[in-house]
């Protein structure tokens, strides 16, 4: 799919990543709550809602739906099944985002104090954090070497544990009961393709796989497999890791400066114009609004500018054509570009920029 757009006046854009490191903040809890409330109301409320119920204005367009923080149930943790997460677990999710969903990585957009502030503010939505304490972090120990024997043992365990009922015999997420699964919020569960490294929400290294098998994913049908001994879980992790096509992993920077190429000639809207052959291509990592097979997770960006206007050429791979749409909530094959208007400082802390999901009141955007 190739699309070219011609507009007047260059403006910046940015994309999101999956990377982040756990830090710390010396500020008091009171100060962090104040900071976190400000950030949450500017950056998070549109999806997660005013009271953290996951019912923000953007919810209708998203699947999976945003997390409801009020129950105090968190999917991705380093603590045992049923336990509250550690603060650093929530921090990790905020900074790294949740691949395969609309939850972006906020590292680079938020300072450490702001991120820790959001951690504290999220915890304030659930009474569990005032009544309970997180259990101790699961100790991983030394990661054993993967060999053909451990993979073979892991495959046997995969079959014995009937993992294929959900994940499919080839780990593509098409098991016989995959379409009939729901979480505790009564939301339908989407089973991702485990051969795709871009679909893993908590990491796809062997230690990450071992950890998720040990903790389970709270609130979902994915239970903990801690009834297996450590060696069995490591073998199962070896088998799953052996099926991951790591060559198709597409890392991205949190924010990308998108550059335009100055030309002297005229600009037309023909995407096959030879002028594009000499224009550098930049890759933008995209976030799917709705989980689906073969999502569009990367767009190739090019731009040229002259004295009269600016043009963009965008290309992406899409195996299934969708040229028409009969419902407003469905989308045909197309692309939209969003430009912040007014005096906006992107790439700066302070959050002067509009909400990236089509802007917000008093901070409008121009959408092409």
Label the model's feature ranges.
Residues 283-368:
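Surface-exposed, glycine/proline- and aromatic-rich loop segments on solvent-exposed faces
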Residues 16-28, 248-276:
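N-terminal pre-domain segments of enzymes
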Residues 11-32, 45-71:
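Accessory recognition modules or surfaces
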Residues 106-153, 169, 239, 317, ...:
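Extended surface/linker regions that mediate inter-domain or inter-protein docking
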Residues 1-9:
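Bacterial N-terminal signal peptides
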Residues 60-107, 112-123, 180-228, 233-240, ...:
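Extracytoplasmic electron-transfer domains, predominantly the class I c-type cytochrome c fold
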Residues 15-39, 129-159, 254-256:
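Electrostatic cytochrome c docking/interface patches
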Residues 30-49, 146-172, 178-184, 236:
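Sequence/structural segment immediately N-terminal to covalent heme-attachment motifs in c-type
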């Amino acid at each position: 799919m190739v699309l070219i757009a011609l507009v007047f006046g260059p403006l910046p854009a940015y994309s999101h990543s999956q990377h982040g490191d756990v830090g710390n903040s010396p500020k008091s809890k009171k100060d962090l709550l104040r900071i976190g409330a400000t950030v949450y109301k500017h950056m998070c409320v549109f999806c997660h809602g005013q009271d953290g119920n996951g019912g923000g204005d953007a919810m209708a367009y998203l699947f999976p739906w945003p997390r409801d923080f009020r129950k105090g149930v968190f999917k991705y943790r380093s603590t045992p099944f049923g336990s509250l997460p550690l603060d650093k677990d929530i921090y990790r999710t905020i900074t790294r985002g949740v691949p395969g969903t609309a939850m972006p990585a906020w590292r680079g957009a938020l300072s450490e104090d702001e991120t820790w502030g959001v951690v504290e503010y999220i915890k304030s939505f659930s009474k569990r954090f005032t009544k309970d304490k997180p259990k101790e972090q699961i100790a991983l120990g030394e990661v054993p070497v993967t060999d053909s024997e451990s993979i073979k043992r892991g495959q046997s365990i995969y079959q014995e544990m009937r993992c294929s009922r959900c994940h499919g015999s080839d780990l593509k997420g098409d098991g016989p009961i995959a379409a009939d699964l729901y979480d505790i919020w009564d939301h339908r569960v989407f089973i991702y393709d485990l051969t795709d490294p871009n679909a893993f929400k908590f990491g796809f290294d062997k230690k990450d796989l071992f950890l998720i098998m040990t903790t389970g994913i709270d609130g979902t049908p994915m239970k903990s497999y801690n009834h297996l001994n450590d060696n069995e879980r490591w073998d199962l992790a070896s088998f799953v890791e052996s099926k991951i096509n790591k060559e198709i992993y597409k890392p991205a920077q949190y924010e990308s400066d998108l550059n335009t190429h100055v030309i002297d000639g005229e600009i037309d809207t023909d995407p096959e114009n030879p002028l594009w052959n000499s224009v550098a291509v930049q890759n933008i990592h995209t976030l799917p609004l709705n989980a689906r097979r073969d999502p569009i997770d990367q767009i190739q960006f090019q731009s040229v500018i002259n004295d009269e206007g600016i043009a963009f050429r965008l290309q992406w791979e899409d195996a299934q054509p969708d040229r028409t749409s009969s419902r407003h909530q469905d989308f045909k094959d197309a692309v939209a570009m969003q430009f912040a208007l007014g005096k906006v400082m992107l790439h700066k802390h302070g959050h002067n920029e509009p909400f990236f999901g089509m802007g917000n009141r008093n901070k409008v955007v121009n959408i092409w």
